[in-house]
Amino acid sequence: MTNTHSYKNVAWIDMISPTEDDISNIVKRYSLHPLVGEELRSNNTLAKLCVYDEYALIVLTVPTRVNDEGSYKIVDREIDFILGKNFMITSRTTAIDSIEYFAKILDTNNMLGKDERIEHAGHLFYFLMKRLYQGMIDDIENIKDALVRAESQIFKGNERKMVEVLSMISRELIDFRQTTRIHRDVWEEMLQSFDKSFFGRDFTPYVKSIKDEFNKINELLLNTKELLVDLRETNDSLLDTKQNEIVRILTLASFIFLPLTFVASLFTIPGIDVPMTTEKWHWFAIVGIMIIISVFTVFKFKKMNWM
């Protein structure tokens, strides 16, 4: 599917799962290099920047947080950008909410004639990247909210359940960072390459602004990771305390019942005439002795601060 948006003299061709004919037509229409066409056909390209005489190819992978049967996971979405002086081509395999939202805003502003800031395709790319990065910031904030909810559950005594929850959130953060870390190289290379490109030096502040947005995402990821580490340490500490308490109780119970078991076994040895087993009241005497031993053991444990 191909959607075309325009603002003033700038055209934006947005392709979703383009066919071979779509790609061939775009390559021919804008006189693109055959290697650019190959990039549009490929869906597994690492983030990179290639600058040609009249246009530039930018490949980025954007992490998106999606709901998968009640749990969340990070899914990578590759976007290919081709930037010319007066055109921008985007190619992707699936719909991305941030891009759909940006397209609606652009069409609305175009009809109302509100936005005077778009003078060439570089400005269009800048505002689209701002929208994409804002969507990523929203996803990280949602992950942070999940950590806050986990924190509440930890202090409600649900430490064992939170082990899996924290592990899932940790996986999200790892996937998010793995996908975005290479963006920095693209923006740094763009700052060097675009200084003498068809957009001119005036576009450099826009690239710096995009890089600043990336740095904001990186900083937010680091802060969220620190919160995760702190919560995991707290959860593990509380879980260890509970487990140690259970072990302590079981150990004390064993010490209490061990002498009782020993006393009871003395009166059940076969083949030996054991006294105090011939009369009915003897049974009550044995039980009384066992109770006295239990009370003494408990008293001793409390005196030693074991209970």
Where do the PLM segments sit?
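Hydrophobic alpha-helical transmembrane segments and their immediately adjacent juxtamembrane loops
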Residues: 25, 31, 212-307
